[in-house]
Amino acid sequence: MAVFETQSLVAAAAALLLAYPVCKIVYNLYFHPLAKIPGPRAWAATRLPYCRALIQGTIVHDFEKLHQIYGPVVRTAPDEVTFAHGDAYNDIFRVRQGHKQFLKDPVWWARQKGQPDSILSAIRPENHARIRKILAPGFTTRALKAQEPLVQKYVNLLIQRMHDKASEVEDGKKGAEFDIGPWFNFTTFDIFGELGFGESFDCLENSRYHPWIALLFSSVKAAAFISAAKFFPLITLMLMKCIPESLKKVQRDHFQQIVDKVDRRLSWELDRPDFMSHVIKSDGTTKMPIGEIYATFMVMTTAGSETTATTLSGTMNHLVSQPDALAKLTKEVRSAFQSESDMTLDALHDLPYLDAVLREGLRTCPPVPWMLPRVVPRGGDTVCGTWLPEG
């Protein structure tokens, strides 16, 4: 009798385990508050297609295809909607009068357990504002203008390296072809190394990535695994164990490199201001907990380098693909300056076509290849004319 009862309980438990996901899928497809929003049914039913695309690194391209099929508003997960509309930025990211603020989605942005906050992971607006206030003086127009000689130094070195490449002989002809994308990365990382840590990564000098920069790119893959695991809280620990040890090591090594760089910079006085100068008090102590400095400068290293290089690469690609635009830009620049030394930040601001090209580059090649998810505030709200429930 006891054996029969045990078998019955096991069978009932198994039936419940099977019934739950089926019922959940039916609910998501037909009864969920987002059920009427267009989108692929497989993505609306479960998070699995979303997470697969995230781990494979195709999610941004998949979203673009979905918007081409379903329009500017697409349901890309049971509880997630994406927008490809000009009003979306103002509705989601700006604080609108009479509306509650859309906060960062903690599934994406919250720090990992046991890790310190960064300017990126700070969910509460007041915490983000505190960190931003400390760093802001380093990003004023006056502060950035003071760094112009340093920026010019690395831009000149980039131009020299490009001249060197153009002088190489390939297939018996002078003028070798080369991928300019990595060279933009070399430049922006070297500049941020000086501005953030008081010393260059010497990528341009050595014509290759610093080993730590290579680690940084590899760590993005680990971040995708971790983000996907967070969508399944009941089995997150088990999923985290499925992340390859090699990727976990990459993330650990990447963070340790940041720790070493920050500690090295804090150990000496620099003869010029940099971003870290605004974090250090006059008595040598810091305005932020050391953990927050590590985490924030890890974010800034990527945000201040790779993003700029991505936009420059995309903009250059558009220019070489459209000879008329390239010729017009070339004419504007060469008619405005007699020599390279005349190309100051102030002078470049006066070139309208250059400004238009850079703005169009930012529009067509956005430097952040991510969705930047936000949570609908309590009570729900409207985005681009579409009502969304809270959460």
Q: Whereabouts are the PLM-identified features?
A:
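Conserved hydrophobic/aromatic pocket- or pore-lining residues that grip, position, or stack substrates
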Residues: 192, 258, 279, 304, ...
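Secondary-structure capping and boundary motifs in well-ordered enzyme cores
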Residues: 14, 127, 180-185, 208, ...
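Cytochrome P450 catalytic core segment centered on helix I
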Residues: 200, 213-284, 351
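Cytochrome P450 catalytic-domain "roof"
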Residues: 57-81, 103-122, 134-185, 189-202, ...
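Cytochrome P450 catalytic-core helices
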Residues: 188, 307-332
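N-terminal membrane-proximal hinge/A-helix region immediately C-terminal to the signal-anchor transmembrane segment
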Residues: 2-130, 152-157, 187, 204, ...
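Conserved cytochrome P450 K-helix E-x-x-R motif and the immediately C-terminal K′/meander segment
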Residues: 53, 57-63, 256, 342-386
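Generic alpha-helical secondary structure signal
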Residues: 40, 126-134, 150-157, 227-231, ...
